Amino acid sequence: MLIDKDYIQKNLLREQEPSSLSSMALDGSAPACLAHANEALDEYNDNANAAFGKIERLLAVRDRSVTETRSRLQRDHYTERAIAESLERALHCGYLDDVRFAEGFIRMRLRASKGINGIVRDLKGHQIDAYAIPGFPDAFLEEQGSQLDNAIRLLERKPPRAKNKKQAAYAKLIRNGFSSSVASSAVKTWIAEREDQ
């Protein structure tokens, strides 16, 4: 939970008012607990420009979703106000775009032989509805090949090493996000090809 500086100051001052005279140091400085409160305030950065700079540095490495960027800024102790302002600015500039992120994410996962179910699940983690992306999944599957071909290619590239090849291959495909029907068809085809060799 991020803490607002004004909130902390108001609540700490309100709590300290009755005892503030008794807790004043001999030299007239602030009470020790207020000094600790100011240190806590320094942990949270309320500078929207600094948060925007952080977004620029993050996006220089790779494209990110709005949700991923927000959680990174929260982890780096920016206040909600700074996060909201910097995200709004990044969206306005076109630095952040969930549709663009999702399209690249889908293509990358399909090239890595991941299944549609796994891609949908991963995009939900970014708070993106995969089916709201234009052309999903058909347009992307046309570019990368069918799910069945991708599943077979995955098994050929990284065959299971267990004794029960059929069960291990099926489990591998399910873990990689393929539907059960695609996984079972791919395993049958893959086993048949191996027996022919």
Question: What is each model feature region?
Answer:
Residues 1-197:
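An alpha-helical, amphipathic repeat domain used for nucleic-acid recognition
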